[in-house]
Amino acid sequence: MTEHGGAAALKQNNLAALRNALYHTDFATKKELAEQCRLSLAACTALLGEMIDDGQVLELAFAASNGGRPARRFSINPNYAHILCLYTANNDVERSGIALRVCDLKGNSLQEKFCPLNDILPEDLTLFITQMVQADPLIRAVGIGISGVTDREGAIESLAFPALNGFNPKKVLEEQLGITVITENDMHFTSYGFYVRNPCDHPYSLSVLYWPSHRSAGAGTVVDGHIIVGSTKYAGELISLPLINSTATKVETVSRMIHGENIVPLMQTAAVCTIALLNPDILFLTGSATLNVREKDIIDYCKQSIPENHMPVFRMQADIHEEYMTGIFSLTRQALKFKH
């Protein structure tokens, strides 16, 4: 990297640090931002000036004085850009369609709705997002959660919506609309959402096992803020685990999983495998199928194979909508491109 390129990269990192600091507070003084981002006061002043000129940052009223000179306060401009968060939902018992939320840069929900659809075609998804962006020109980034696998270029492999197989909404929408688009597996978004919504004062890891009614199960893991996606982003596809016993074939076991039949042994096996391979601090058991499961039955089974001192904290939570949306928003905001 050239000296000029290195300086440019450093500047972008510093701008990102300032934005991240402002995302997580209502306002801050220049001195507070400089200290938090480990910048000199002069560098912080110059960068804030550029961000103010671009509209990213707002100058607020002076802070109350404690006898000295009052300090100017700064805040992120929540309406500099809006983010469209959506995911494809498919559950034979509940509902199928597209769940969406539009947020400002602070994460405040501006609009939320569910659009029922029996099937989702590529043109449906493209038209739907295009209409949303046309209705709100401030939408500059879109995060799309998929019930299935997405590759590193954004192409979809979905069993829930076969018509989307091979479709790359990221490529199509970025070319057509000139906005930032990310696509990701549902459990990768969701596990990151759990991580964001369960902050800790030290690095930690968590895994999420998701058992919906009438759909195949999935899993996601975050270690120290990093999602474990795997080399081809196939990590977490529980349907590929050898969840069989002496009386059931693989096909029969998968059918049981999808139809919610005799689900406890499958959850127990998946939990043991997750703990043995990933050793998370926290293991979330989620999805509507957990409503009829006792947490104690899973824990007792795990203790038969996992030493007590290596057992995670177990938490059970049926609904994951808020975590899913939080993960989509957080990762899409990270990907949003700025002029400065």
Where do the PLM segments sit?
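ATP-binding/phosphotransfer module of carbohydrate and carboxylate kinases, centering on a glycine-rich
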Residues: M1-E112, I120-Q131, L138, N245-H340
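Short glycine-aspartate micro-motif
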Residues: I83-Y87, A141-G143, S205-Y210, G218
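Hydrophobic beta-strand positions
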Residues: V102, V149, G220-T221
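Glycine-rich phosphate-binding loop and adjoining helix at the ATP-binding site
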Residues: S109-R197, H202, D297-S305
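Glycine/GP-enriched mid-protein hinge/lid loop-to-helix segment characteristic of carbohydrate kinases
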Residues: E112, Q176-I275
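Short glycine-rich anion-binding loops that position phosphate/pyrophosphate groups of nucleotides
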Residues: S147-V149, H214, A289-T290
